[in-house]
């Protein structure tokens, strides 16, 4: 997965997804929102050591939307 959008501490960086990777996965925590590009359409659940289980959802379009 390729990080497309990182929003933390008021800093926001956005980048377009490639045409073949236009499905986005969203990982949200209390202070930040991570956006990933994914070529598949399957939504998965990710668990990180320092965070509780986070729900990841897919969004359509060539840009990752909040």
Swiss-Prot record:
Tissue: Expressed by the skin dorsal glands.
Cysteine pairings via disulfide bonds: 3-24, 17-37, 43-58, 59-64
Keywords: Amphibian defense peptide, Disulfide bond, Secreted
Signal peptide positions (record): none
Name under which the protein is recorded: Xenoxin-2
GO annotation, cellular component aspect: extracellular region
Function description: Lacks alpha-neurotoxic activity, has apparently no antibacterial activity, nor anti-coagulant potency.
Native source organism of the sequence: Xenopus laevis (African clawed frog)
Subcellular location(s) per record: Secreted
Gene Ontology terms describing biological process: defense response
């Amino acid at each position: 997965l390729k990080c497309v959008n990182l929003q933390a501490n008021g800093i926001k960086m956005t980048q377009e997804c490639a045409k073949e990777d236009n499905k986005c996965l969203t990982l949200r925590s209390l202070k930040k929102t991570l956006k990933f590009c994914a070529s598949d359409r399957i939504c998965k659940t990710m668990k990180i050591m320092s965070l509780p289980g986070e729900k990841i959802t897919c969004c359509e379009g060539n840009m990752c939307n909040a």
